Regions:
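Extended, histidine- and acidic-residue-enriched regions that form the cofactor-binding/catalytic faces
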Residues: 1-75, 79-95, 103-252
Length: 252
């Protein structure tokens, strides 16, 4: 009954999505799901928007060789998220806020957003780690580095294995002149080029900087998570006001 009451009065829903994948030996496999879940708990305290159960699995092609990683792939994730949104659309949802914890999910989420627009709705994709960079450039970080490690410390310090934090980041270069700088990125003569490789061919333990996890603190994580949650609450209030027909129309 409460769901029916909600959709008679509201058309906005919030869905979390993450992944189960390696984030280095120091971090839990569920990092990308734990962080959105924690943010949703914070948001629920200040917002009346309907929050759906988090989708814990994502598209994690390059990391799937690490033990414990669970990969749906971009196509299946697109189908799963699409079905979830279709069901909610049937009940009256028209504004979909997707709180995303994993970069590999972005292509699938974008496709669902295009589908929703064609049906008369609108989707907002909130990639928490990118948003945090805009809120404070000092928070900018890479996969399993200081930013994500700080977030997990802010949630539960016992989830970070401090014995595995120390040590330099080791990236496997493509050659003496093609230097690895990220998951797929390499640098040659000051220019970035992408050479897709499975992550075990790039990093020795699953995390990629440039920020080091040893820079993370619990205080940093708590402040970053609270700031992000507060922003999302504010954003959703503005998102509710959007004229969908005008925003998604072709007249400028």
């Amino acid at each position: 009954p409460k769901a029916g009451e909600y959709f008679r009065a509201h058309d906005t829903v919030l869905i979390g999505i993450g992944s189960i994948e390696c984030h280095g030996r120091h971090m839990p496999l569920g990092t990308d799901t734990l962080i959105p879940d924690f943010l949703l708990d914070k948001i629920e305290q200040k917002s009346d928007v309907l929050i759906c159960p988090t989708i814990p699995y994502g598209a994690t092609e390059s990391l799937c060789d690490y033990p414990g990683t669970i990969n749906l792939g971009t196509e299946l994730l697109y189908q799963v998220l699409g079905r979830v949104c279709d069901s909610l659309f049937q009940h009256g949802a028209r504004r979909f806020v997707i709180l995303n914890g994993h970069g590999g999910n972005i292509k699938s989420i974008d496709r669902v957003g295009y589908d929703i627009q064609r049906k008369g709705g609108i989707l907002a994709e909130l990639n928490w780690w990118l948003m945090a960079w805009d809120m404070d450039p000092a928070w900018k970080g890479g996969h399993g580095g200081g930013e994500e490690t700080a977030a997990i410390l802010g949630i539960d310090p016992s989830l970070v294995d401090q014995s595995e934090v120390a040590g330099p980041m080791k990236l496997h270069d493509v050659s003496d002149t093609l230097k690895a700088t990220g998951f797929t990125s390499i640098e040659y003569k000051g220019v970035t080029v992408n050479i897709p490789r499975l992550t075990p061919s790039v990093t020795h333990n699953g995390w990629i900087g440039p920020d080091h996890p040893e820079t993370a603190t619990e205080e940093w994580g708590r402040k970053m998570l609270q700031t992000t949650a507060d922003y999302i609450v504010d954003f959703m209030e503005e998102f509710k006001k959007v004229d969908i027909a005008k925003a998604c129309g072709t007249e400028f």
